[in-house]
Amino acid sequence: LFIPLFGWYLKKIGSISIEREKTTKKNLNFFITIDKVISKTDRPLIIFPQATRVLPNDRSPFKKGAARIYKELNINCLPVAINSGHVWPKIGEKKTNRIITISILKPIKPGLNKEKFLKTLEESIYSELDFIR
């Protein structure tokens, strides 16, 4: 939730944050928490699969946790591409005065295996980021 403006909005609407350092294969309580929040509030699940802001040309593989959540909860995934890396780089770097584009992409239906899901998600988001750059 540490993305300027967008992160503040996510916090304001009551989004939950998954602390990567505390999440292990043995500690699956966060699945229960996520499932309860989604079912009670009818809110979407938003995952930042890179787990950090990246520079515009960075094509690092997405984290496997996104696929794990998708598979465990058996839910639709609505990919969102945000090109904020060129405006708000990581902490300590100079910010620029430019426009950020947020693109909501075609949903990915449940049922894909983890590898196919990650490949589909990466292709969807990265092709959109190339377009909105």
Question: Which residue ranges define each predicted feature?
Answer:
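Catalytic core of membrane glycerolipid acyltransferases/transacylases, capturing the structured
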Residues: 1-23
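Non-catalytic C-terminal accessory region of glycerolipid acyltransferases
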Residues: 28-133
